[in-house]
Amino acid sequence: TAISAATAGTDYVAPGTATTFTAAQTFNGSSSVLAAVFANAAETTTIAATAATGTINYDVTTQSVIYYTSNASANWTVNFRASSGTSLDTAMATGQSVTVVFLVTQGTTAYYNNAITIDGTSVTPKYQGGTAPTAGNASSIDAYSYTIVKTGSAAFTVFASQTQFK
C-alpha cells in the first residue's frame, strides 16, 4: 500500500513523534466534525525583566503571552505585528483572528496601555464594558487581553480588556 511504502517524518507524521511545523497547517472539519481537537497545548510566553514604557512591538508569530516583570515606568503603546519583518496584515487573512495577552507588573505608581497600533497604524479598540482604562492598578499585575480580528485589507477590529491580579 502507499502508506507502507511511505517514510515516517518525510511522507507523513508518525504517531507519537514530536514534530515541528514551520508553515501554517490547515485542518478542515465539516459541519458536524471539528477540524482539530487538543487534549492539551502550551503557548509560548516571553518573560522579560523589562518595564512597560514607550512603544512595545508585540510580534504575534513568536509569542502568545508577554510578561514584563519590572514595574511599568510610563504609559505605553502596543504595536501588534507578525514579526519585525512581516506585517500582521500580510500574515493574516480576512476573517482570521488572533488572541494575545500582555502581563504588566505595576509598582506603587501605576501606568496603563493608552494606545494600540497594528503595523504602526492607530486602532481604536472595543473594551470590555465599553470604557477604555484610564489607569493601571498599583502594586499588582495588569493583564491586557487582545483579540485582533482582520476584517479586510489593512482593516482590523481589536477587542481588549484589562484585568487586575494581586
Model-predicted segments: where are they?
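Glycine-centered loop/turn motifs
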Residues: 9, 53, 95-97
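Residue-level detector of beta-strand structural context in well-folded domains
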Residues: 17, 23, 54-56, 114, ...
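Extracellular beta-solenoid/beta-roll
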Residues: 29-69
